[in-house]
Amino acid sequence: MAPIFKSLALVSALFAAISSAAPVNLDKREVDVVWTTVTTVVWTTIDVTTTIYPTPQAPTPPVVESTPTPTPSAAPEQAEPIETSTQPETTKSQPTQPSVATFIPVAAAAAAADSAAPIPEEPAPQPATTAAPSTSTTTQAAPSAPPAANSGSTEKAASSGYSGPCSKGSPCVGQLTYYDTATSASAPSSCGLTNDGFSENVVALPVGIMTDADCGKTVTITYNGITKTATVVDKCMGCKPTDLDASRHLFGELADFSAGRIDGMSWYFN
């Protein structure tokens, strides 16, 4: 029995040594690794202003409206009454024939009645020949009418740009500002044009008086004793009827840019 106890004692001592040597961590926990991905989204708002201009197709119709179309209709109307005037001329030639017939009995008493028959036949073609030049006079009267119509239209066209408000005799007085002209063909001015505002003297008329026919017209501007001429290429949406919006080059020739807006500017259409 003694050897068994000894072996048991040795085994228990061995287990005690092993248990004391092995660390015991009762509070040990599993370590969890957590990966966190943070995404930051930044929204940036950019204000973009787009100006939409109407298509500049209106200037062409006034050019197409030419006066030659009514002139051919007027020529035949004048030719018809003139042709009626030729008819009484033929009636006047007819009484001459019986006057010749009155001489026939005198010739019949002197000679034979048969010889008098060919005599009235000869004067018959004579009034026909006189009728021919009368028709030629009608052809001369017809072309004389169209120039009169054309002269009236040219007088109206010449007087249309020189009367009314903002004319040389009655110039408009208002404010003058400056703007950046249209330089891109994709966004032209209201007249369908692009201009270099840093080198050209151009203006925009007030929207209240601007028409398509004003595109390309020139105006004379006077301020502080300085007079300049500019071409109309655009319309100003915020201008009063007597104001103008000028290119930078034109404004710089009349005043300093620091003024921004000048009063007492007078202008008129040329």
UniProtKB/Swiss-Prot annotation:
For the region Disordered, what residue ranges are annotated? 53-97, 113-167
Polar residues bias: start-end ranges: 83-97, 150-162
> What InterPro entries does its record include?
Expansin_CellWall, RlpA-like_sf
**Signal peptide location in the record?**
1-21
Taxonomically, which superkingdom? Eukaryota
What keywords tag this UniProt record? Allergen, Signal
Q: What SUPFAM superfamilies does the database record attribute to this sequence?
A: Barwin-like endoglucanases
Query: Low complexity: which segments have biased composition?
Result: 63-81, 127-149
| Alphabetical list of PANTHER family matching this protein | PTHR31836, SRCR DOMAIN-CONTAINING PROTEIN-RELATED
Per its record, how is this protein called by name? Answer: Allergen Asp f 7
